[in-house]
């Protein structure tokens, strides 16, 4: 993340987390600056022009801060000419299992934010409502295969025709880069004050086959940006 615009976007997106304390602020900056999926979802125009979002396993809400900052800069006329318009955000709902992260989100966004609502809950149990976009970034492999399939079926049922499910997975067939991903995942989760049990990962081909069998069209693209990892973005749309 080197261009002046991206630095401005990063500053704007991480600003709300100053009120959440040193860790929340620097965690948001580190994640948003080093993780190419945030930039690419905007640059490639993957998101609808306007819509309601549900982020499952949302953590402290870094994705929402990023999208809000993007829309603010777009409306101010500070936006790359070759990028699609930043999406209009009708509703941003996040579900996070860990109360510590929910508390950090509350300090960042406040209790009466007009768009953002982040709640403590388990994605295996909560009602998904009727969003236009559902995201799971790096949390789908935290629970077993049967629950993964159940969550994906419920995501498909919750989305409207053409609705977007955007996720990122670690490709279990990638060898050493996959194992490096897992090590980093455990390390980051530990720093956030949590512990991870076994991770339930799959080869990329198996993820794609499962999602297509549930009624999604699937496109996939590596999201590593020069790092020796095995992260893959899956862009899934309900037929």
Residue map of PLM features:
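Helix-capping/helix-break motifs at membrane-protein junctions
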Residues: 144-145
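Short catalytic micro-motifs in class I SAM-dependent methyltransferases
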Residues: 138-139
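A short glycine-rich, Lys/Arg-flanked "PGG" loop and its adjoining helix->strand segment in the class I
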Residues: 149-161
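Class I (Rossmann-like) S-adenosyl-L-methionine-dependent methyltransferase catalytic domain
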Residues: 1-51, 60-127, 166-239
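Conserved beta-strand/loop positions that form the S-adenosyl-L-methionine
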Residues: 56
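A conserved beta-strand element that flanks and buttresses the S-adenosyl-L-methionine
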Residues: 135
């Amino acid at each position: 993340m080197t261009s002046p615009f991206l630095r401005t976007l990063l500053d704007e997106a991480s600003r709300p987390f100053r009120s959440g304390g040193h860790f929340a602020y620097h965690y948001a900056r580190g994640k948003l600056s080093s993780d190419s999926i945030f930039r690419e979802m905007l640059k490639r125009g993957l998101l609808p022009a306007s819509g309601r979002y549900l982020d499952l396993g949302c953590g402290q809400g870094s994705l929402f801060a990023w999208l809000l900052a993007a829309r603010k800069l777009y409306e101010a006329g500070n936006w790359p000419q070759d990028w699609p318009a930043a999406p209009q955000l009708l509703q941003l709902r996040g579900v996070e299992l860990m109360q510590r992260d929910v508390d950090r989100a509350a300090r960042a966004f406040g209790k009466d934010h007009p768009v953002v609502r982040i709640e403590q809950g388990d994605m295996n149990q909560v009602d998904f409502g009727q969003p236009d976009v559902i995201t799971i970034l790096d949390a789908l492999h935290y629970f077993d295969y049967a629950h993964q399939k159940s969550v994906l079926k419920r995501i498909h049922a919750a989305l409207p025709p053409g609705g977007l499910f955007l996720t990122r997975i670690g490709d279990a067939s990638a060898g050493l880069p996959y194992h490096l991903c897992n090590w980093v995942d455990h390390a980051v989760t530990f720093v956030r004050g949590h512990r991870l049990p076994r991770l339930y990962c799959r080869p990329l081909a198996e993820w794609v086959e499962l999602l297509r069998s549930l009624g999604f069209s699937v496109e996939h693209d590596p999201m590593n940006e020069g790092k020796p990892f095995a992260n893959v973005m899956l862009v899934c749309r309900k037929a």
